[in-house]
């Protein structure tokens, strides 16, 4: 059996040593709470260099997914009514939190994803650039009015948030491909349900923790984790079938394309 690494005792030479070890979470984040899987199941996350077990994270299914979707739908009722300036400030606060913990994020990515530390640091900067960019874009969500063929009419376009966005992230950029989806959704006034990659879910859970620290309200960001197989299929099917999900975005695995998710 693989030895489980206790984060507090990782050697100084290890890329896993974190200045802020509270970033590491094994539970999922739903409606502002850290929760176990309703089925009681867990799954290991391995250090890709040593094959040691870094953490035992939750392994969730359909019921957990439906709970997260409901939380996002309820949060949408208030989040969608926030002003662009409020959403701008929330995203800037998250940007600052990620900046403060950039080196820890890089080390976490090295451990769970396996890329070199230089690449991991680049990913963190890349990931946070989306948060910064869409913080500013929140202020520029504007409608417009154009002339109509009928001189007595005008055509007016009003931009409104879609609703709950279900976001499926890949393993190869476990932080950047999540901020790339979450940041514009939040800027637009949408709430989110994130399916973290089961091979490398710790970055997504750390992001949820920092979002909480940044003051982002409960239910606006929800993060789920499932293993490859039955639970993942149940989760994908729940995301596709829910009438409360208004947007589905996936940068996905070869075995987990959107048609595959929605047909299982």
Where on the chain are the PLM-derived regions?
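Histidine- and aromatic-rich ligand-binding microenvironments
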Residues: 30, 44, 56-67, 215-220, ...
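Single conserved hydrophobic/aromatic residue that forms the stacking wall/gate
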Residues: 255-264
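Terminal low-complexity tails and localization/encapsulation signals of metabolic enzymes
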Residues: 2-56, 89, 93, 125, ...
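Rossmann-like NAD(P) dinucleotide-binding subdomain of oxidoreductase/dehydrogenase enzymes
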Residues: 143-256
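Glycine-rich loop-to-alpha-helix module at the N-terminal edge of alpha/beta enzyme cores
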Residues: 52-142, 152
């Amino acid at each position: 059996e693989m030895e489980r690494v206790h984060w507090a005792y990782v050697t100084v030479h290890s890329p896993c040593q974190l200045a802020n070890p509270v970033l590491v979470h094994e539970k999922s984040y739903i409606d502002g709470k850290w929760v176990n899987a309703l089925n009681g199941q867990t799954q290991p996350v391995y250090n890709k260099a040593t094959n040691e077990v870094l953490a035992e994270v939750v392994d969730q299914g359909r019921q957990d997914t439906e709970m997260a979707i409901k939380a996002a739908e309820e949060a949408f009722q208030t989040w969608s009514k926030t002003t662009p300036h409020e959403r701008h400030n929330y995203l800037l606060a998250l940007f600052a939190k990620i900046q403060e913990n950039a080196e820890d994020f890089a080390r976490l990515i090295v451990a769970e994803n396996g890329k070199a530390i230089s690449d991991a640091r680049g990913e963190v900067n890349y990931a946070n650039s989306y948060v910064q960019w869409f913080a500013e874009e929140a202020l520029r969500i504007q409608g417009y009015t154009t002339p109509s063929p009928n001189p007595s009419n005008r055509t007016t376009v009003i931009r409104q948030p879609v609703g709950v966005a279900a976001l499926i992230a890949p393993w190869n950029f476990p932080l950047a491909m999540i901020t790339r989806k979450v940041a514009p959704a939040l800027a637009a006034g949408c709430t989110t349900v994130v399916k973290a990659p089961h091979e490398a879910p710790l970055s997504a859970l750390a992001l949820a923790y920092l979002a909480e620290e940044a003051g982002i309200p409960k239910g606006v960001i929800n993060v789920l984790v499932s293993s490859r197989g039955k639970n993942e299929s149940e989760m994908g099917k729940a995301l596709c079938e829910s009438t409360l999900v208004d947007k589905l975005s996936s940068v996905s695995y070869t075995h987990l394309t959107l048609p595959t998710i929605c047909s299982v």
